[in-house]
Regions:
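Short helix/loop capping segments that flank catalytic or ligand/cofactor-binding pockets
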Residues: 20-23, 57-59, 87-89, 139-141, ...
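Short secondary-structure boundary/capping segments
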Residues: 27-28, 63-67, 92-97, 172-176
């Protein structure tokens, strides 16, 4: 949480979500659990497009915290983003700088450093939970995973961040039945889930609480 100040000569603040409230955190956690449990029963893969800095670490923390409860030992969790791997390593190496002892590490986490590591993931037909960038699906390794999994009805895509107009991620959120990836039309048969409550921006209550301390 941001530190609170009581004095300032001038306050400049962002207000991206100043006119709305985020979804309840517990509701978000329950929805994530439900999606993953259902995906396990259907024997598919789960794709999570995520920003490399911040959002990925929040997802990893969430999965590690609920590792036993969600029966995640049945999955292989792939972190397929060189930048996200480097950023996450900082979290793991500096637990003393974080609340509650830092970010726990998933025992079944696989770090996919190279392009060859990333390509090998797409040989898995089930049991792969893949976290990769970019967060809006406009580039990065997630695009390849989408190409290999979107057409499969047993697979799931969990959208955990804002998707700007015109992006591939936004097309998925909007329910497009076909998307264009690498000059190919890919049918969208996977289930697309939009999970709120994980925004890095404070909502109206957060902003009022923060500036109310002055």
């Amino acid at each position: 949480d941001p530190a609170r100040n009581t004095e300032a000569d001038l306050v400049l603040m962002e207000s991206t979500y100043g006119n709305r409230l985020h979804r309840d955190r517990e509701a978000t956690v329950r929805e994530m659990e439900s999606i993953i449990q259902d995906a396990d029963h259907r024997r598919g893969n789960v794709l999570i497009p995520a920003f490399a800095v911040g959002r990925t670490q929040e997802i990893l923390h969430l999965l590690a915290t609920h590792y036993a409860e969600w029966n995640l030992a049945r999955w292989k969790v792939f972190l397929d983003s060189p930048m996200a791997i480097r950023t996450s390593q900082i979290y793991w190496d500096t637990p003393e700088l974080h609340d509650a002892g830092g970010m726990p590490r998933l025992p079944n986490l696989v770090l996919s450093e190279s392009a060859e590591d990333s390509q090998a993931i797409n040989r898995l037909r089930s049991g792969a939970l893949i976290i990769a960038g970019s967060g809006m699906c406009e580039g990065g390794r997630i695009v390849h995973h989408l190409k290999h999994n979107l057409w499969r009805p047993e697979c799931d895509v969990i959208i955990v961040g804002y998707q700007a107009n015109g992006t591939l991620g936004r097309q998925l959120v909007d329910g497009n039945t076909y998307v264009r990836i690498h000059q190919e039309n890919i049918r969208v048969r996977a289930r697309i889930h939009t999970v709120g409550g994980l925004s890095a921006h404070g909502d109206q209550d957060d902003l009022v609480r923060w500036y109310g301390s002055f």
